[in-house]
């Protein structure tokens, strides 16, 4: 039951609708450029200031933003490289499924260190995808995606 709940949360309630808005509609309607990506990342990140992720004060609310910021950068890079919003949906859903694994490992996701490290790891993911695409080691949908 927990796994089905997490799949529902990961893909149907968050991954699909959020990516449809942020990397689908907003990013694409602004032209799919770097600037569009930056706007999508900033808007997605700032929305999470009101998230309930265990933050207890304003400093923790700011630190919490590291995770959605890093994730949003990775989602934009994946969407831009692949040319598909579905890739971002997969990354988003995978992120939530990874949370289930962390929960099973009894890892404290509600700690500021976890938020900052998680955000940093997402930035590493974005960098790796970007490098692989740039050096044509990853299939890209368009030549423009190579110029990330």
Language model features with spans:
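A glycine-rich, hydrophobic loop/mini-helix early in the fold
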Residues: 1
């Amino acid at each position: 039951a927990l796994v089905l709940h997490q799949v529902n949360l990961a893909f149907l309630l968050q991954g699909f609708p959020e990516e449809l808005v942020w990397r689908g509609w907003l990013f694409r309607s602004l032209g799919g450029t770097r600037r569009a990506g930056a706007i999508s990342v900033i808007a997605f990140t700032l929305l999470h200031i009101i998230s309930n992720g265990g933050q207890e004060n304003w400093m923790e609310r700011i630190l919490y933003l590291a995770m959605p910021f890093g994730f949003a950068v990775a989602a934009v890079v994946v969407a831009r490289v692949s040319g598909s919003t579905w890739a971002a949906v997969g990354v988003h859903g995978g992120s939530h499924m990874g949370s289930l694994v962390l929960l099973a490992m009894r890892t404290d996701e509600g700690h500021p260190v976890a938020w900052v490290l998680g955000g940093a790891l997402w930035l590493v993911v974005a960098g790796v995808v970007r490098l692989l695409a740039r050096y044509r080691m990853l299939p890209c949908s368009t030549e423009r995606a190579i110029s990330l």
